[in-house]
């Protein structure tokens, strides 16, 4: 019954920020917005690819910097949702779902 479900279902694992590459004074890690990771699959995403990289110490993006808007635009493309789709905020203001992002080419073959 579930065979082929990933053809039309996108699976996304991510957080809203990364974590510092070093341990802080309390033995933990702090928020780190300069670099973060996401894992995507299904719905037309290419399998087994890595897009972009950080510096050796994990502090900065070393290649292929993308934004959260780019990731959202790529998810919308994978699900065949128009980038012109709008929704209404609580105050009634129309908002574009893609918000100006670009498709990340390395995620699709």
Model-found features: residue ranges?
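Ligand-binding pockets and gating/stacking loops
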Residues: 1-109
């Amino acid at each position: 019954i579930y065979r082929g479900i990933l053809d039309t279902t996108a699976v996304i694992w991510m957080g809203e920020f990364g974590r510092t590459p070093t341990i802080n004074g309390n033995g933990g890690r702090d928020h780190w917005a300069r670099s973060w990771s996401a894992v995507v699959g299904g719905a037309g995403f290419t399998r087994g690819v890595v897009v972009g990289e950080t510096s050796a110490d994990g502090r900065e993006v070393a290649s292929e910097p993308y934004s959260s808007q780019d990731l959202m635009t790529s998810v919308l493309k994978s699900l065949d949702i128009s980038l012109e789709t709008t929704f209404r905020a609580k105050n009634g203001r129309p908002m574009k779902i893609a918000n100006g992002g670009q498709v990340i080419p390395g995620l699709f073959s």
